[in-house]
Amino acid sequence: MLDGLKMEENFQSAIETSASFSSLLGRAVSPKSVCEGCQRVISDRFLLRLNDSFWHEQCVQCASCKEPLETTCFYRDKKLYCKYHYEKLFAVKCGGCFEAIAPNEFVMRAQKSVYHLSCFCCCVCERQLQKGDEFVLKEGQLLCKGDYEKERELLSLVSPAASDSGKSDDEESLCKSAHGAGKGTSEDGKDHKRPKRPRTILTTQQRRAFKASFEVSSKPCRKVRETLAAETGLSVRVVQVWFQNQRAKMKKLARRQQQQQQDQQNTQRLSSAQTNGGGTAGMEGIMNPYTAMPTPQQLLAIEQSVYNADPFRQGLTPPQMPGDHMHPYGAEPLFHDLDSDDTSLSNLGDCFLATSEAGPLQSRVGNPIDHLYSMQNSYFTS
């Protein structure tokens, strides 16, 4: 009995030691790590750990310049970047100079755009806008309140004959509001005629430079306008107005061309409809009412075949009445009272001609209802 107990205790102790040994082996032998960069198993002695992922030493390099990263790095979309290329690719850019904005810089925001403090200025007078100033963001460009009102006055003074090039949608709305205000003040007698500003006449070289820049971009940025103004010797305001007028002119030409194409298509459709379907439709409308009438003999044969046909007796039970004269569904002819001379047939033809407009069914001489009435009268009189 004691020997059996000792054997069980030795067996249990052996199981416990084997389990502890296997657990130790499991902790020591861990699965090999996979590099996040090259997706290969890391078998090196040393490895690098970045954001809970493992890397080879040679795989830790910038994805743009391929330079090894030693001290710091930037991680985005499972790729590593150095500071310079990360800011160049992913940093927020200024809406004025289109350069990257450093994280430690102060910025000014206008709707969805972000600007440097030095770039947050009016595109006409180049006055830096401060906090609390009123401004207008038009086509991605900043305008202070004074220059915006001047632009509205300038657009309102342009007559329709002088501005044959047309205006854009937003400029047209501004002009309409300005003209409406002017009319109201002139009726009150308080408005006086403003002096017209001198019109700038461009030279051939200036016009060529503007057109070449317009072909590249119809809405140039502030730097491009400044360079054009410096090259041509004009002000930035004149350059901006020329580009606005040119854009409006292109829009008007496109609308006019589209309208001409629509007019041509409409004229072609009308001409084709007149040549193809006009004459035939008219002749058909004239000839349809005057169809040939059948002869009286044909009409008589048709009526006899219609009223003596078998479908009149389908689903009906002949009445069981005394007398041989009651055979409403019999085979006796319908037109037995008519004479066979030509006069009766001519009268029948006149009857058909008189009732031809009422339809073929109404123009028949006999009628099943009349036949039933005649049978009823003959029954009660007998």
From Swiss-Prot:
Subcellular location: Nucleus
SMART domains: HOX (SM00389), LIM (SM00132)
Biased composition (Low complexity): 256-269
UniProt KW Nucleus keyword: yes
Cellular component GO terms held in the UniProt record: nucleus
GO molecular function, one term: metal ion binding
Sequence ranges assigned to domain LIM zinc-binding in this UniProt record: 33-92, 92-154
Nucleus as UniProt keyword: yes
Major location category of this protein: nucleus
UniProt keywords, alphabetically: Activator, Developmental protein, DNA-binding, Homeobox, LIM domain, Metal-binding, Nucleus, Repeat, Transcription, Transcription regulation, Zinc
Segments of the chain annotated as binding DNA: 195-254
Annotated GO biological process: axon guidance; cerebellum development; dentate gyrus development; locomotory behavior; memory; midbrain dopaminergic neuron differentiation; negative regulation of neuron differentiation; olfactory behavior
Region (Disordered): 161-204, 252-284
Function field: Acts as a transcriptional activator by binding to an A/T-rich sequence, the FLAT element, in the insulin gene promoter. Required for development of the roof plate and, in turn, for specification of dorsal cell fates in the CNS and developing vertebrae.
Name of the protein described by the UniProt record: LIM homeobox transcription factor 1-alpha
Native organism taxonomy: Eukaryota, Metazoa, Chordata, Craniata, Vertebrata
